[in-house]
UniProtKB/Swiss-Prot annotation:
It comes from Burkholderia vietnamiensis (strain G4 / LMG 22486) (Burkholderia cepacia (strain R1808)). This is ATP phosphoribosyltransferase regulatory subunit. The lineage of its organism: Bacteria, Pseudomonadati, Pseudomonadota, Betaproteobacteria, Burkholderiales. InterPro entries: aa-tRNA-synth_II/BPL/LPL (IPR045864), HisRS-like_core (IPR041715), HisRS/HisZ (IPR004516), HisZ (IPR004517). Heteromultimer composed of HisG and HisZ subunits. Pathway: Amino-acid biosynthesis; L-histidine biosynthesis; L-histidine from 5-phospho-alpha-D-ribose 1-diphosphate: step 1/9.
Length: 382
């Protein structure tokens, strides 16, 4: 076996890709900061039970596990940063009001999410804690769309769903609630025959409502159909009202509603929003409300947020990260050194050509040169 081979679905990030990823990371974190989000940096490694407080069986399967040589306890390499941020909010910050936090860091997955997906993602996201109202969801949705526009993406489609609809239907029917996981699988997979089989012996109202969910998809007008076909329950009315406001606030993007798109249902407690772009089959960003995320840490605060994979974003983003630079000669000259230092202090990239390598081009576009004219070092176009 060659010593330079990497594990499957693990890859090096080479200069051009790394530069683009870093450019996008800086843009997004700066935008998060402009909204008032504070950055946190949780550790890559934690005790397993701390990492698996939410997310269910899927998160457990995706988490790498190893034994701590100091304590003998089982550790996990994080597969999702969101639970870590919830821990920070609950125990380390322990604030009473609204807290806005953001992050960017590597996560590891035991299995890739798709055929060509990496098992080492760079997750970036933002979270609001402490406000149960829809205003927080509206802000997070706007920030997510803002981030995608900053990355140069267009023709964005925003898919909306709400965990409260299914939760309300199950809460009114104990028999349906006992089959909750199977119903969730059938709805998420749009498996109508299985759904009919699972609902045959349920009450008429619950049966009709559950069977209607796979057909309640389309543009925002489908919410009117949902009001007509679903039971008039306060939780369902509130969920549909929330989706209507989220749809109306999403300016400049295509909006779709799918009341059976319940991926992440076990994790979310309210509105869920997912962003897609043309030509990319998988979601590029996901977000939503998860008010119970801090419960395992003894402090279940209202919470909503979103995240995306920076490596995938860089792959599809048209943002050009190949920077321009100034080419300077290499010489032991105090005036040259002072000129180079001044340019770098001003934010310019200055590359000094090492002796014998003047003809070698790197990935920076050297569109200017630092040359000596009449005893002074000046920048000229190349």
């Amino acid at each position: 076996m060659s010593t330079w081979l990497l594990p499957e679905n693990i890859a090096d990030v080479l200069p051009s890709e790394a530069r683009k990823i870093e450019e996008l990371r800086r843009r997004l974190l700066d935008r998060f900061r402009s909204y008032g989000y504070e950055m946190v940096m949780p550790p890559l490694l934690e005790y397993l039970e701390s990492l698996l407080t939410s997310g269910g069986a899927d998160l457990r399967l995706r988490t790498f596990k190893l034994v701590d040589q100091l304590s003998g306890r089982t550790l996990g390499l994080r597969a999702d940063i969101t639970p870590q941020v919830a821990r920070i909010d609950a125990h380390l910050l322990n604030r009473q009001g609204v807290t806005r936090l953001c992050y960017a860091g590597h996560v590891m997955h035991t299995r890739p999410r798709g055929l060509h997906a990496t098992r080492e993602q760079i997750q970036i996201g933002a979270e609001i804690y402490g406000h149960a109202g829809l205003e927080a969801d509206l802000e997070i949705q706007q920030l997510m769309l803002d981030a995608l526009h900053l990355a140069g993406l267009s023709r964005i489609r925003l898919d909306l769903c709400h965990a409260g609809v299914l939760a309300a239907l199950l809460a009114r029917d104990a028999q349906a609630a006992a089959r909750g996981e199977a119903l969730y699988d059938a709805l998420s997979g749009k498996d109508v025959p299985l759904l009919h089989e699972l609902t045959d012996d349920l009450g008429a109202d619950t049966r009709a409502a559950l069977r209607a969910l796979p057909h309640l998809y389309g543009d925002a007008s489908v919410l009117d159909e949902a009001r007509a076909r679903l039971p008039v329950l306060p939780e369902i009315t509130r969920a549909l009202d929330d989706l209507a406001q989220l749809a109306a606030s999403a300016k400049g993007v295509e909006v779709a509603v799918d009341l059976a798109d319940l991926r992440g249902y076990a994790y979310h407690s309210g509105a869920m929003f997912t962003a897609y772009i043309d030509g990319v089959p998988n979601a590029i960003a996901r977000g939503g409300r998860y008010d119970h995320v801090g419960q395992a840490y003894g402090r279940a605060r209202p919470a909503t947020g979103f995240s995306l994979d920076l490596r995938e974003l860089a792959r599809i983003s048209p943002v050009e990260a190949r920077g321009t630079a100034i080419l300077a000669p290499w010489a032991q000259d105090d005036a040259l050194s002072a000129a180079v230092a001044a340019l770098r202090d001003a934010g310019e990239v200055v590359i000094q050509a090492l002796p014998g390598h003047d003809h070698v081009l790197d990935e920076f576009a050297c569109d200017r040169s630092l040359v000596e004219r009449a005893g002074a070092w000046v920048v000229e176009p190349r």
